[in-house]
Amino acid sequence: MLTGGIIMEFEKIVDLHCHILPGIDDGSPDLEHSLDLARAAVADGVTHILATPHHLDNNYVNHRTDVIKAVQNFQNELAAEQIALQVFPGQEVHINGDLPQRYADLLGADEKKRYMLLEFPHSNVPAYAKRLIFELQKLGTTPIIVHPERNKEIQKDLNILYDFIQHGALAQVTATSYAGGFGDHVADISRQLVENRLVQVVASDAHVLQGRNFVLSEALKQIATDFGPEQALEFESNAEDILNGLSVTANGYRKIEKKKRFIFS
């Protein structure tokens, strides 16, 4: 990958958030589409994917055992098509007050459930979110708050995310957001979150070939241009470490100072 004359090379690219499994949520509608998504991922440089279908979001329920079986079946299809992509089972878990009671049915981002993708509603941040995150931490799981840049309440006050990071959570920005696929406003927020180190990983959140495809390498290239190749490499290293259940912590994060507005007479 070229970035302003700097050559960026990844031995592997790990995508921690992807709706590639066929026909189980609002992602890929069928197997053929999933295989085409897999080819697009490989073309984008992705080598490992955490398959993260929606779970408990009022539209979809994807139980742990069902996701594991779906991943096994899909991996067999990838092998038959000679697509060099390794897929792992996960979930995008929608925040619910009873997640600790459902814990046995939840999949982590890693085999030991040290990390878990946690989705907030798009419109708000539930009042019980801090308590729930603390309860998950007591169970040994660090929540990774997904696509905070698209949450309407966080958009109005980015320091809401700062508070969660300060209390031990991690956060993931979406590649499409950073690359401008959700508009300039979301792209600007994404940049601010990266600049202030309030996100620790970037992932595709790819759903379908048209509109929400793989732009992970494009986003990493832009991040390297904006903040240096070390930042892009750190994001990818974090993704690999999370998948392997190794230690990843937020560091260097800071509050975002609101810009003062001056009225001139």
What annotation goes with each model-predicted range?
Residues 60-172, 250, 254-265:
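Extended substrate/RNA-proximal surfaces in nucleic-acid metabolism proteins
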Residues 42, 137, 194-195:
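Non-catalytic positions within long, well-ordered alpha-helices that form the structural scaffold/packing
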Residues 1-82:
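An N-terminally biased module of ancient metal coordination in phosphate/nucleic-acid-related enzymes
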Residues 59-67, 81-86, 211-238:
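Short acidic, glycine/proline-enriched helix-loop-strand junctions
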Residues 17-21, 147, 207:
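Histidine-centered divalent metal-coordination motifs
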Residues 198-214:
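Short acidic/histidine-rich active-site segments
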Residues 220-265:
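Mid-to-C-terminal alpha-helical segments outside catalytic/metal-binding sites
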Residues 56-59, 94-96, 150-154, 178-181, ...:
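Active-site environment of divalent metal-dependent phosphoester hydrolases
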